Regions:
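N-terminal periplasmic "start-of-domain" segments of outer-membrane beta-barrel proteins
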Residues: 47-78, 122-127
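Short acidic/polar hinge/loop motifs at secondary-structure boundaries
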Residues: 124-151, 202
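Short loop/turn motifs that connect adjacent beta-strands in outer-membrane beta-barrel proteins
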Residues: 173-180, 209-215, 289, 396-401, ...
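Outer-membrane beta-barrel signature, preferentially recognizing the C-terminal barrel domain
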Residues: 380-384, 591-597, 679-739, 760-766, ...
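Gram-negative outer-membrane beta-barrel transporters
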Residues: 736-738, 748, 756-887, 927
């Protein structure tokens, strides 16, 4: 592989140099005549204090850059209750975030969540098998000096983003003018979890003068231990087909199809997150022209899941339910087609419609919802690091930067799930599926609130909390290990030119060696191993009993029993022994895979400064050539039932040109033009040749494709910026992205045999899934989901930004400032999705439009701040439109899942006791907005609904 890379480097060097020479020959050669030429080099790295100063320095840095970059500086970060990098980023135009358990977890930049996360310009590695880099939730905001979101890349930047590159800048010591010592202690109350959480951070740095040159040292520490709780309700949209329907919507005398509740579950989502993070930098100015440096960052995140869940099955009857005519129904219009859905009714009322073909061993012929409780005990333990050694040599008109770096992450994820079924304790066959007690449920959709709970009198809390009613159905024990690693070497050479147009020429090479390995231990008890909850009474835990208390008058199933997730984690080996599971776990070759990926890049960029038609102009033009060599290895079950090691290799070369131009027609106005060819390689999970068999029969089997090609796009930018006062700006930008293709999901119902899934209805002639055999193991035929290269499309948008500090207002209003951002994005995709034929008629499928994942049409944020010498305050409201979460997810029967539009209000205040100490008060999710996720269509039936904490914190900050 390395020989291929060396040959490629030799063959492409001449091409890259030729590109820049050609660009030089067509440039306009005139001297610049601007009075103040602002360049990137003119803005030094400084430590800033206060909201106003941080905004001013960030804006000056943005203005100086030739390529479009959004910047947020340290005190701007610290003045809001932002916990991690994702939450900081939602202040930026064109950026939207999503939250998990109320904490920022996913970021979309200009309609794409396929971004690249760097620390000081270097690669980071994820906790799992995705691309992009370190998880946003793993990187605390307290380590950050500044955040750069590069929307238009240059040739010297590492490829890998379709949205933007997010570069996290940490502190460095050589440019400190005085010692830096900042300590922050915060105590936070989480409302749903009803817990006080602790947060500590500190940054210490200094510059020392020695006989052998100046030395700058700085380090930042962060630690938090917090509980969060997000309760979730899931009700998958099911289908009542026309042949089984008794509801006539169009008056033709025939039953019509509609959406109705399918499988579901509810969950008390308690988590304990402990994060310890460190970053440090050591710089040595050996000589005036030579600097050496060493930098490192490290995070250690432990996320303990203490969730309790109740699985809600579907009624047994495949005919129309009793009382359906008494229900209420609604119709939504999608792409000109009317889609009917049930909006309220009793699900599973009566005696299975008076059927006489039930087997005689069914103890409870009443129809209704099957109840299965389970714990969600699991940990994610991740250690991530980034380290670099390098130097910078300045010699006359030559600058050389050389560096070696390493990034890695080691993750262990555990999951121990015990499932109990709500059964009749008096049944002779108590430990069996047929002893189940079915409970009719009330279903009601009311705007953006979903209600789903047992009919009054159908079941009592005393029964649900009696361990004698619960029979263990199955226990699943799983442990996954992820090892991510990347090594990189680069040399950048910059010539500063004595030329009328070209100011510098940068040439560089970079090589990287990337690997990811996943291994998994997996074991499962037989169905109905013969334990009741009473047999494991010392491990039991009752649910909190306050599910979705925000909706006080609604009906939900609040009370039930599960095994205690915390005890399971601490006594896992003991439980394995009780349940006759292997004490150390069993390696599952069908769940492991590895990907090795080597890259080599060569790049050339020319920076120019001139005039065009008498207008001062500056910018850059360049090209990046990148060679990729991949090998994906894993295991595969062939048609003859044998298990074999498999590996697939591929390589490809891409050329990525880019250019930026900044015009300054008058002193306070800039016009930006940008172009870049960008690419994103498939996620490692998508490249896996190993078939991933989940234990849950309701989940599809994911099958990777090691021949997937990268996604490529061309993007164009135009922006007008008016810097009307220091620290103030009004800007309007337009962007357009033309995607050659995207990687999406293809769903094939009944497309694969899963030998790991357990069918709860095995033996039931009505409900059991079709069976199969693979590798000598009995299995169940389930849905297959595979990644595929899908047609592309276009994304275009407008970004409007306004920032202003009011300086001449009368007291007490002097000190007010405002930041407002608005984004509009429009996606046009060369792909639709088909609903099953029940919507359009017999054996027909209806086509509906499908947008890009993570793209919200409209989003905005508005921040009002007030700063005086003694105190400051901020309040920020953010909003984003609905967006597509996934083209194909199990919760909506292999059809799309959306997130509804949502806003959030955060606020912060601080009061300076003296020059050293300040008291802080912060609030997050003050309006306690719920997350609502429709299935199938953006305005379809609610498939998921969740409620996360409102968090209030008090703290003290010291700066010495």
């Amino acid at each position: 592989m390395k020989d291929k890379i060396l040959i490629w480097l030799q063959s492409t060097l001449a091409k890259s140099i030729s590109f820049i020479v050609l660009a030089t020959s067509i440039a306009v050669a005139q001297e610049p005549d601007t009075e103040e030429a602002t360049t990137e080099a003119s803005v030094e790295e400084v430590i800033v204090y206060g909201i106003r100063q941080s905004l001013e320095t960030a804006l000056a840095e943005k203005r100086a850059k030739a390529n479009l970059t959004e910047i947020i500086n340290a005190d701007d970060i610290g003045k809001l209750p932002d916990e991690n990098v994702a939450e900081v980023l939602e202040n930026i135009p064109g950026v939207q975030i999503d939250r998990s358990a109320g904490i920022g977890s996913d970021v979309s930049v200009r309609g794409s969540n396929q971004n690249r996360i760097e620390i000081n310009g270097r690669s980071t590695t994820p906790s799992g098998v995705n691309r992009g880099g370190i998880s946003f939730s793993d990187l605390p905001a307290s380590l950050v000096r500044s955040l750069n979101v590069i929307k238009v890349p240059t040739a010297v930047m590492v490829e890998g983003s379709l949205g933007g590159t997010i570069d996290v800048k940490t502190y460095r010591g050589l440019k400190l003018e005085k010692p830096l010592r900042v300590v922050r202690v915060v105590s936070e109350y989480a409302e749903n979890a009803d817990q006080w959480n602790e947060n500590f951070s500190a940054t210490l740095g200094n510059k020392f003068s020695t006989e052998r040159g100046d030395v700058g040292a700085i380090m930042s520490l962060s630690h938090f231990d917090k509980f969060v709780r997000e309760d979730r309700l899931r009700v998958s949209p099911g289908v009542r087909q026309a042949a089984d329907s008794q509801i006539d919507f169009d008056g033709d005398g025939l039953g019509d199809p509609y959406y109705r509740p399918g499988f579901g579950d509810l969950e008390y989502g308690l988590e304990n997150r402990v994060n310890t993070a460190f970053s440090g930098s050591l710089e040595w100015q050996v000589k005036d022209d030579l600097k050496l440096y060493a930098e490192a960052s490290y995070t250690d995140l432990n996320k303990q899941s203490r969730r309790q869940s109740m699985f809600l099955g579907t009624p047994a009857s495949d005919l129309e339910l009793d009382g359906a005519a008494d229900g209420t129904y609604g119709v939504v219009e999608v792409a000109g087609y009317d889609v009917p859905m049930l909006t309220s009714g009793i699900i599973g009322g009566g005696i299975r419609n008076g059927r006489t073909d039930l087997s005689t061993d069914v103890d409870d012929p009443n129809d209704g919802i099957q109840l299965r409780s389970n714990n969600r005990a699991g940990n994610r333990d991740t250690q991530s690091y980034v380290a670099a050694l390098g130097g910078e040599w300045d010699r006359d008109n030559l600058n050389i930067v050389f560096e070696v770096s390493a990034a890695g992450s080691d993750t262990v994820e555990t999951a121990f799930v015990s499932v109990f079924q709500f059964n009749n304790p008096d049944a002779a066959n108590f430990h069996s599926a047929n002893a189940r007690i079915r409970v009719p449920f009330e279903y009601e959709l009311d705007d953006d609130v979903l209600e789903y709970g047992p009919v009054a009198g159908a079941v009592t809390d005393a029964q649900l909390l009696d361990p004698n009613y619960w029979s263990m159905f199955v226990t699943k024990d799983q442990e996954s290990t992820f090892d991510n690693e990347e090594f990189a070497e680069k040399v950048d050479v910059t010539w500063f030119l004595d030329h009328d147009v070209w100011r510098s020429l940068k040439v560089g090479v970079r090589a990287s060696q990337r690997s990811i390995n996943r291994s998994r231990q997996s074991q499962v008890t037989p169905n109905w191993p013969g334990f009741s909850a009473a047999d494991l009474s010392s491990y039991l835990l009752a649910s909190p009993g306050d599910f979705f208390d925000f909706n006080g008058g609604a009906n939900y199933l609040d009370n039930f029993l599960t095994l205690d997730p915390q005890k399971i984690e601490s006594q896992r080996e003991e439980l394995r022994d009780i349940l006759a599971l292997d004490a150390t776990g069993i390696n599952d070759p069908l769940q492991g895979f590895s990907v090795d990926e080597d890259t080599a890049a060569i790049y050339v960029r020319g920076d120019f400064e001139t005039t065009l038609f008498g207008i001062p102009a500056r910018g850059n033009i360049g090209v990046r050539g990148i060679y990729t060599d991949q090998k994906a290895s894993g295991n595969e079950v062939f048609t003859d039932g044998t298990l074999r090691d498999v590996s697939y290799s591929q390589n490809y070369t891409e050329w990525l040109p880019s250019a930026s131009l900044v015009l300054a027609p008058i002193d306070k106005v800039q016009i930006r033009f940008g172009y870049a060819s960008i690419m994103r390689r498939p996620s490692f999970n998508d490249l896996s040749p190993t078939v991933q068999y989940p234990l849950n029969i309701g989940q599809a089997v994911n099958v990777g494709d090691p021949t997937l090609q990268p996604t490529k796009a061309d993007q164009y930018d135009l922006a007008l910026e008016y810097y009307f006062r220091k620290g103030s700006v009004l800007s309007l930008g337009y962007f357009y992205k033309d995607l050659e293709g995207v990687i999406g999901k293809e769903t094939v119902p009944g497309g694969i045999c899963n030998p790991r899934a357990v069918d709860a209805n095995a033996g039931d002639p009505e409900l059991a899934r079709p069976t199969c055999v693979v590798d000598g193991l009995d299995g169940v035929i389930v849905t297959r989901i595979s990644p595929v290269n899908l047609p592309g499309g276009t994304i275009e948008g407008l970004e409007l930004s306004y920032q202003h500090v009011f300086r001449n207002l009368p007291e007490p209003f002097n000190g007010l400032g405002v930041i407002a951002n608005y984004s509009y994005q429009d996606g046009s995709r060369d792909l639709t999705f088909s609903t099953p034929g029940f919507l359009a008629g017999e054996d027909e499928a209806q086509e509906f439009p499908l947008n890009f994942v993570g793209l919200s049409e409209k989003s905005y944020n508005f921040t009002l701040f007030y700063e005086k010498r003694k105190y400051s305050a901020r309040i920020r409201y953010t909003y984003r439109d609905s967006f597509l979460v996934s083209e194909s997810v199990d919760v909506s029967n292999g059809q799309p899942l959306y997130t509804h539009d949502r806003g959030q209000l955060n606020a912060s205040m601080s009061y300076n006791l003296n020059d050293t100490f300040a008291i802080t008060l912060n609030g997050v999710n003050l309006l306690k907005e719920r997350k609502v996720q429709p299935g199938v269509f953006a305005n379809g039936p609610i498939a998921r609904m969740s409620d996360s904490d409102r968090r209030i914190s008090v703290g003290i900050r010291a700066r010495f």
